[in-house]
Every structure is written in structure tokens, then in C-alpha cells.
Amino acid sequence: MLRDKTQTFLLTHGIDLDPSLDEQQLIDEEVIAKLVEFSGTGDEDTVLEIGPGVGNITEGLLRRAKTVICIEKNPKYIPVLKERLKHFPNLDIVLGDALHEKLPRSDRLVSNLPYMICEAFLQRMLRMDVKSVTFIVPSGFAKILEARAGEQEYSKLSLQAQLFYTSEIHMEVPSSAYLPTPRTETCIISLVPRMSSSVADEALKQLFRQGDKHAKNALREALIRAGICSTKRQAVSFIAESDVPVETLDRRVTRLSLNEIESLGNWLRTLVD
């Protein structure tokens, strides 16, 4: 059984799992097979896996993908991965932090994503070009991503996720599928990039892709990239003549509130209607 195999790897390499650091290992072969299946991974795909741990998901991906790139923050797992998966020539192991490391180009993202980085990593994903994202995440987080305007869970994160992706929650993952058992309910969710339904939506996407710039500068670039303005001078003029509050323009994009983002979206729509 995969549980026994995992425990052997941990014991052999002297690894203690720390639940406070989201170090739960997926040990249910059926759930792993479903995760790989839902990801749509094929033999032409390069897959990026975040936080492989002892490599239980990694092994399943390696049997289907052209290449699997693993980014693991904790060095204690690297010897396990190298020993266990040494017979797979299509594996590339990277020691680094997925929130700060320059991420390699990939076709798909697959991960039992560490719970504490879910929101922060989603912000990184907004600037990535991939076919699909298939993650195991807390069920509460998945509900936020799918929440509609007016619902209690709806937030800035909901707006961003739905602007960039279509989502599907495939299945709940039983707590028995992990070692050790988590206190959080989890599920498998897939996100597929969404084509912009309007020029205004594309401009809003481009705004979010500006990272931590001040909104005024990010908005200027977004207007140009979305094709609303052809020059910086024109974009600056549009912003200067707008009714967007100075406080909003001076705020960094990552600090904008849901209300501010919705107001910016409404203003962008007036430019193209």
C-alpha cells in the first residue's frame, strides 16, 4: 500500500512530517490517479508540480507527461525524490520557493497545493500562460473561487479567479487519503484559462498582471495592452479625465479592494461601450 511505502520513505530518510507546515502527503492511489486524470496531462505536456513532498503525485505524473518539473521548498525531501524517481529521465527537480522562484515554462500546473500559499500562488498564476491548473485545495478556498457576486463568500479573489479562469470542482478528497490526517476538508479543482469576453475585461486582466505596481501606472499599461489606447500619452489623458479617486490610483494593485476593482471595471466599460 502507498501508506506503507510512504512511511518507509520517511523513516529511511529520517523525515518527520509537520502538519503546521502543510506537510500532509497524499497516500490514496485512487485519488492520485483521479488528480492526474482531471489534469488532462498527456505525453506532449510539460507539467509543473508545486511541493511534491515524497513524490507520490509526481510518480503518477511522470508516467503520463513528457516532462515533470518539481519545485520543492524543503531540502529534506530532495534525497527522497532523487532516490525514488531516479529511473525517470523526464524529471527535473528544483529546490526553491514557488512563491519567489522564477517559474519555468510549463503546459499544466498540478499540485496538492500547500494550504498556506493558495491565495498567494493564485496571484502568481495570473501572470502565467498554461493550458490548465489542477490542484487539491481546501474546500472553503474552492468555494471562494466559485462564489458569485452577492454571495457571502464572494471576494476580490472570486472576481480575479472568474475573470481569468473557468473552474470545476471535481471531487472531495477524504481525510483518510492523507498522512497525517488534515483538519481541513479538501477537494480537487481545475482551472482553465478563460478568453476575455470584452475589451474591458481584458484591460482588467492586464491591470492584475502588473503585479505590485501603483494602480495609476498599471492602469496606463493595461489600457495600452488591451488596445483601448495606442500611446502612453493617450492613456495618461484618459486616466486624468476619469472619476477614479486619487486614493485608488495611488494604491498598489495588490492592495485594491473589491469595491475599487469593481469601480475600475465599470469605468473601463464606459470607455469601450
Give residue spans per PLM region.
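Catalytic cores of RNA-modifying enzymes
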Residues: M1-Q206, E260-D273
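An accessory alpha-helical subdomain
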Residues: E185-P193, S197-W267
